[in-house]
Amino acid sequence: MSKAETIRSAKLGKKELRLVRMNGRYFGLADGVKCAEGENADDVWRQLHDDAGERFLTFFPNGFHSDGYASQERDYKLAAKVKLDDTATLEKAANGTGFGEAILAIFRATNMLSPFEKTRLQDVLRGPHADDFVQAAARFTLDVSNSHLLAMEQALKPHDNAKWTVATYLPYLWRPDTHMLRKPKATKDFSTRVGHRFASEYEARLSLPVYESLLDLAEKS
């Protein structure tokens, strides 16, 4: 099996479109899910873009100029990062205390987590493990190490919320240039289709090798 190669990419709404070449064929992916396949790169890209565009226009009939597009698909995430940087700077969060309510507001500011995860986070960030979790997340952002990931797991596990989306959310907002938000299903689907080892190495438990594999997938895609 040849190495998968991304030869073209674009954004359409919140969707990330990629044209990937592997084993002499071309695959059109929308957020890691295969939507088109063929032997001609231009045809596959056109089909992928047309299909994704039709779904996008279902929700935003006037395209990128539709009322509500910016607030729903872009601005609220940028606003969450600005608010995080203003209320809990990375350096202060790594060693400070009392950031629980501020961090809870950041989690509530986007739809990147499930309602169940957000509900459990309220117990985490208003309970005795709040400082432990925030400090561990900040330290993991600064230094991707097993000890910091384990510290996050220990703070989240009593509330049944040691999930990849929760653990990677703050690092992604603090340092989007070096960290990735892990959404297991989409990431596994994409890695399977492009032949990356992440699909076979993935496990639900927070594990440093899994996260390092994710970063490798992002770098090579």
What are these model-predicted stretches?
Residues 167-174:
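Short, hydrophobic/amphipathic alpha-helical patches that form generic packing surfaces
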Residues 2-160, 176-221:
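An N-terminal alpha-helical hairpin/helix-loop-helix interaction module that forms a charged
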Residues 166-167, 221:
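Intrinsically disordered, low-complexity boundary segments flanking structured domains
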